[in-house]
Amino acid sequence: MNPFNPDAYCGIYCGACSIAMHGETGRADGFAACLGSVPTEELICGGCKSDTVYAGCSTCSLRHCAREKGVAHCVDCADYPCKMYSRWQSVAKFLPHSREAVSGLAAIKRDGADLWLAVQKKRWSCPDCGTPFSWYAPECHKCGHKLVSETYKIYGWRKLLCRFVLPAAYRKGKAKSSTA
């Protein structure tokens, strides 16, 4: 697997991705737990800008578009915000971490990707011990520091949605990769 790249085309910080964290630590947070039907050995990802992408993300239309156009981020495209990005946002809003994409792109455009990545790395690291944590981790797996105010929760209808939509995205990605 190539080195992990936490940068994403859409403005999400892949460094706090539950699937990437699971691949690194073997621990499943609330988000990764929604993927119960996905084989554990497939919960790995090098980030959406890598060649080793989790099957559920491999079919992302934004990723394919940005790669085709040769842009580092959607905000670098002359068509941004386009219909594709707006459609993705209307669906992505159901997953709390995805809501940060637009503000992430604004920060990338304003401050540059390197500064944005540094800020995100600090934000998604435990304030007590510096260990990285995922969007949905309730506490630091190393020191036990409570992270509830700094992370997202999946509960109620979102948890139900998560249990169906995420495995469906995985199956779609696997089906597409097996026919390629």
What feature does the model see in each segment?
Residues 1-4, 176-180:
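Basic/polar N-terminal segments that are highly enriched at the extreme N-terminus
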Residues 36, 115, 119, 177-179:
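Contiguous alpha-helical segments
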